[in-house]
Amino acid sequence: MLNLFQIMNMINNDVPTPYGFYFQDSATPNQEGILELHDNIMFYLVVILGLVSWMLFTIVRTYSRNPMAYKYIKHGQTIEIIWKIFPAVILLTIAFPSFILLYLCDEVISPAMTIKAIGYQWYWKYEYFDFINDNGETIEFESYVIPDSLLEEGQLRLLDTDTSIVVPVDTHIRFIVTAADVIHDFAIPSLGIKVDGTPGRLNQVSTLIQREGVFYGMCSELCGIGHAQMPIKVEAVSLPKFLEWLNEQ
């Protein structure tokens, strides 16, 4: 039987779908901003494409009918001013929201907890800095892809892992990403997260998950023969369930 998280993933588009051509449903403010920016820019591009196509069609039709074309099509100060100012305005309209969103995505706002993700060839290791177990040690574990031969009904090939990142919803979370060998990339589409893991360097990204669910990601930097075996699985749960999970560690 499907568990609650699998049913939620069927309602919300939180997993890759065959022949999918659009984004997964957003679960964070950052991803919501990315979707809105994408849709706005696509609108501008469609308008520009239609305008340029109409101009090309009009010019070709005019020249084909009359080789001695209207003089202001070839030499006109007004049209030259228009096609310089109009594209500049469009670029500024696109650029300002992009810069604002880029700044907001890089901003880390008073994180309530920090998780360190370390990329190895070819698995992930996670460390919860803010919590310790009964032995006085930081909670940490490794995450490996589930082999095809061990997949159970409802699990996703090359996406499900033996252990998951468990986080509470409505909580500011900071991910610190690095790597131990080669460059990896920590990417989770539904959360709007994509940050490189570079050996000897710590990169950080902040997120605020707004709903419960299971979110999948992958290493998005070619890192060797086992690159496809580096999935990321995040389970967002309520705070009581998260505390219960912590007590089990």
From Swiss-Prot:
Catalytic activity: 4 Fe(II)-[cytochrome c] + O2 + 8 H(+)(in) = 4 Fe(III)-[cytochrome c] + 2 H2O + 4 H(+)(out)
Record protein name field: Cytochrome c oxidase subunit 2
Signal peptide extent: 1-13
Keywords: Copper, Electron transport, Magnesium, Membrane, Metal-binding, Mitochondrion, Mitochondrion inner membrane, Respiratory chain, Signal, Translocase, Transmembrane, Transmembrane helix, Transport
Coiled coil: none
Binding site for Mg(2+): E221
Membrane topology annotation: Multi-pass membrane protein
Cofactor or coenzyme needed: Cu cation
Binding residues for Cu cation A1: H184, C219, C223, M230
InterPro entries reported in the protein's UniProt record: CcO_II (IPR045187), CcO_II-like_C (IPR002429), CcO_II_C (IPR034210), Copper_CuA (IPR001505), Cupredoxin (IPR008972), Cyt_c_oxidase_su2 (IPR014222), Cyt_c_oxidase_su2_TM_dom (IPR011759), Cyt_c_oxidase_su2_TM_sf (IPR036257)
Record note on cofactor: Binds a dinuclear copper A center per subunit.
Matching Pfam families: COX2, COX2_TM
A GO MF label: cytochrome-c oxidase activity
Topological domains, Mitochondrial matrix: 63-80
Location in or out of the cell: Mitochondrion inner membrane
Superkingdom of the source species: Eukaryota
Record field: transmembrane: 41-62, 81-105
EC number annotated for this UniProt entry: 7.1.1.9
GO cellular component labels: mitochondrial inner membrane
